[in-house]
Amino acid sequence: MISSQAFVAGMCAIGAGLASIACIGGGIGTGNATAKAVEGVSRQPEASGKILSTMIIGSALSEATAIYGFLIAILLVLKIGNIG
């Protein structure tokens, strides 16, 4: 039979791994936004200022979810050390 402490530690490790998937999503979102911004600037160079400012705002929102996932993963990993 598995102890409750080992079970909680295992679930924290699984949760940390799943939370770190948010970092992958943030990277993909930022990459897609940058690719489309470069494509838009190449088509309309005169609108580069507006395109780039919109891209920066979108990238910030995309990276916010990655940062939240990273912080949750860190908190769960630190919780594993305090279970014992």
Swiss-Prot record:
Predominant cellular place of this UniProt entry's protein: membrane
Assembly information from the UniProt record: F-type ATPases have 2 components, F(1) - the catalytic core - and F(0) - the membrane proton channel. F(1) has five subunits: alpha(3), beta(3), gamma(1), delta(1), epsilon(1). F(0) has three main subunits: a(1), b(2) and c(10-14). The alpha and beta chains form an alternating ring which encloses part of the gamma chain. F(1) is attached to F(0) by a central stalk formed by the gamma and epsilon chains, while a peripheral stalk is formed by the delta and b chains.
Originating species: Clostridium novyi (strain NT)
Sites marked Reversibly protonated during proton transport: E63
Cleavable signal peptide: none
Function per UniProt: F(1)F(0) ATP synthase produces ATP from ADP in the presence of a proton or sodium gradient. F-type ATPases consist of two structural domains, F(1) containing the extramembraneous catalytic core and F(0) containing the membrane proton channel, linked together by a central stalk and a peripheral stalk. During catalysis, ATP synthesis in the catalytic domain of F(1) is coupled via a rotary mechanism of the central stalk subunits to proton translocation. Key component of the F(0) channel; it plays a direct role in translocation across the membrane. A homomeric c-ring of between 10-14 subunits forms the central stalk rotor element with the F(1) delta and epsilon subunits.
Transmembrane segments: 8-28, 56-76
Membrane topology, as annotated: Multi-pass membrane protein
GO terms for cellular component: plasma membrane; proton-transporting ATP synthase complex; proton-transporting two-sector ATPase complex, proton-transporting domain
Family label: Belongs to the ATPase C chain family.
SUPFAM superfamilies: F1F0 ATP synthase subunit C
Record Pfam families: ATP-synt_C
Keyword Transmembrane set for record: yes
Listed InterPro entries: ATP_synth_csu_bac/chlpt, ATP_synth_F0_csu, ATP_synth_F0_csu_DDCD_BS, ATP_synth_F0_csu_sf, ATPase_proteolipid_c-like_dom, F/V-ATP_Csub_sf
Molecular function via GO: lipid binding; proton-transporting ATP synthase activity, rotational mechanism
Alphabetic keyword roster: ATP synthesis, Cell membrane, CF(0), Hydrogen ion transport, Ion transport, Lipid-binding, Membrane, Transmembrane, Transmembrane helix, Transport
Localization annotation: Cell membrane
Protein name: ATP synthase subunit c
